Amino acid sequence: MRVVYTGGEGEITEKKSRFIATVKPVQSEEEAVAFINETKKKYWDARHNCSAFVIGERQELTRCSDDGEPAQTAGRPMLDVLLREKITDVAVVVTRYFGGVLLGTGGLVRAYQAATQAGLAASRLIEKCKGQQLLVHTDYNGLGKLQYLFGQKHT
């Protein structure tokens, strides 16, 4: 599974509207909601602060908000990017400063998806995998056997 190691901020401009995507790693719904509220306070003068987050090893918890944009044109496209990229334990807020030109529903969907991708590109993503740490005591003769065993494809 892929997770955000360090968050970032990406920005795009579409027909004079400015879209700022802020990305942060989160571990719980409470942490995601707190981050969304912090970002809304930071960009209090923006027209919209749309959000999406995914939490859980199997992406069990997903939420999104259009924050006043037409239904399914902001939060859901942002969430779709996170799900398609198989990224979890992440929250994204895309802030929109309206530039005076209406984008239409298709334009909004593309803009919010592009902004989310820009935010992810500005973040550091890592592959997280389960593992265990082992402490093995052996003599020098056993070292070669262990190296062979751990070098096998399915261990």
Q: Can you annotate each of these PLM segments?
A:
Residues 1, 141-155:
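Terminal interaction module
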Residues 1-73:
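C-terminal regulatory domains involved in ligand/effector binding and gene-expression control
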Residues 10-14, 122-127, 155:
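Short, flexible, solvent-exposed loop/turn segments with mixed acidic/basic and small polar residues
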Residues 21-22, 50-51, 89-92, 133-135:
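Structural motif
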Residues 32-35, 112, 145-149:
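Hydrophobic side chains in well-ordered alpha-helices
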Residues 44-46, 86, 151-155:
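Short secondary-structure junctions
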Residues 74-121:
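Active-site beta-strand/loop microenvironment that shapes enzyme catalytic pockets
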Residues 125-142:
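Short glycine-/aliphatic-rich beta-strand segments at the starts of folded cytosolic domains
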